[in-house]
Structure formats: structure tokens, C-alpha cells
Amino acid sequence: NWKRKLHVSLAFGEQGVYPGELCTLKQIIQNKKRMPLPALQVKFQADKSLQFQDETEAVVTDHYYRSEVFMVGGRKQITRTLPFRPQCRGKYSIGQIQIAAQDFFMSKKYVAVLPENTMIYVYPRQLSMKQLLNHNKQVLGEIVERRSYQEDPFYFRGIRPYQPYDPMKHINWKASAKYGELLVNSFESTYSRDVCLLSDVETDSVFYRQEMQEAAISAASTLADYYLRKGARVSFRTNGREDTDEEIVLEQCQGIAAITALNRRLAGIDLAKDSADFARMIRQIIPNCRQSRQYVCITTRPVRDILEAVTLLQSKAAEVLLVVPQIAGEDVQIPAGALAWNI
């Protein structure tokens, strides 16, 4: 049997990346039997948006089709590393490999299809927060504040003279000996902000439909990254649907690991599927909204029904922001009080 002790596999070198990052796909061929295979053909296809750098053995049309012939000696292993740079958000997989071989007389050809299950997440493209923060820093708020309730020992501010109310454990003995007076470590005061991001993936744009949808997803991912890295607890809800039709709802995530978890869900949003009504989604959370939570609504289409829902949410919650991502060439009327994000 020509397939006996022959193993062919593909494996992405990374589990999750951002668009434009350099990634690798490893192609491994193992022939564990003594008999060599003089001409083993290996074929597979991948999404063309992955943009493989080596196209010498490939054809790119609707997909990236690669076909390569190997001479595999007995008890030998061949490893190919194929670099690529993904260009678009998504969840990409390679489901099968086709192999073919001929006998020594080239009179017979044997073909087999091998199942494969390698996958990579391409996260939403990250946007620049500079333009948004420069104009709206006081609105978005800082997670680290000087006038909060409790000092956090993880946020070191500096050294100051000792005061009678300072605990002994805060005395910096090394600095005190150096300067000849009692000095204590000073810390920033912090609080953990509770943020809920509501993301609309639908758009009214005709000429820039996909660009506007991707801008909304990227804006949600970038804001979530910003808040999570600041130490906030972030909840997330979107009217987009994954390829499994599952609704994307995350509650009170925290920490760097939550960024990966959220981006994986956002990578799986299938824009070909019908999205839920965003205004209705906002109205559904109003009965259970919290005064202590900051709500951030992200939409590229601030139409009447959405604005009415946001206004109703503002009447129930203490802090509600409306963020409107914009792209060049698309004229969107920004409502009063909304934060425009030029992308």
C-alpha cells in the first residue's frame, strides 16, 4: 500500500494574528517506510486573502491553489515553511489535502484525499486611538485617577515626605537613608471601570458597504483593547452573527486574555448573514442597565431609530457614549454629542 506509513499535514504557525502580520504555514511530509516515493504530488487550497509570498508552485484565482511534487526518500521527512501575510479579518481553515503518487514505472497513478483541520484567526484591524483620544479624552475617561477611593500598590507615582498618617510599610528606607529624612512611596488611586460596548455591524452605505462594516468591527475591537488594557471590566454585545449563527455576547471580561477571546469571536463574524436590529438590541438591555456602567454604542449609521434608542438609554444610565466611525469618501451626519472617529 503506497499510503502506508505516509503522513502529510499542514499547520499554521500562529493561532491568531492581526492583518498584515507575517505568519507561516508548515507543510510536513513523513515517509516512515523504507520504500521511497519518487514523485509525490501534494495539493491544497487556501483563501487568497492570506496572500502567500511564494507563488512559484501555486495559482491564485478565486483561491490560492498550491501543487508541488516531492521526491521523498525512505524513512525521510520533508518540511516546507510557507510565509504569508493575511489581509482581511476572518476565520480561515484548510480542510483537506490531496496527494498523488505513481509507481516506479510511471504506469499507474494513485490519488487520495486526506482530512486536515488547521485554522487561523485573523483579528479585526486595529485603528489609531490618537485622533479619538485627542478630542475626547475627558469623555472616554482615564482608568487611573488621582481622586478615587483607594491607593493601588501596582500604580507607583513617586516618593514624598513622610506624614503622621502614613503606614510604616510605605516608608522607603533606602531613599530615606540617602536624603536624610523619612520618605514614603506614593501610589496612584485607581478604580475598575465597568464598560459595556454595543456594536452595530450593519450600514446604510451603498458604495462602501463592506469597508463601513469592517470599520465598525475594527472600532469595537480597538475600544475593547483600550479599555481592557486599562484594567476595566468589559461587556460586549453585537448584532453581527458568527458563521454558526451564534449571538456574540460577553459579560464582564477582564485582563489581556479577554482581548484574545473577544477578537476570536469578532474574527468569526459572517457579514453575509442577516444582522439583528441594533435599535431593538439597545432597547432590550435598558431594563437591566446599571448606573455604575459606562455604555459605548458604536455605529456607522446614526439613523433616527438608533438615536432614539440611545437617547432612551441615556435617560436610564449615567454615562452613555455614541461613537460613529467614518471613512474617507462616505458623508455621515454626526449627531450632536456623538464622537466622530475618522478612520
Annotate each language-model stretch with its function.
Residues 1, 267-343:
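Von Willebrand factor type A / integrin I
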Residues 245-276:
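Short, charged loop segments at secondary-structure junctions
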Residues 187-189, 226-228, 253-257, 285-288:
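Short, conserved, surface-exposed binding loops centered on an aromatic residue
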Residues 2-246, 294, 298, 312:
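An amphipathic, basic-hydrophobic helix/alpha-beta surface used to engage anionic
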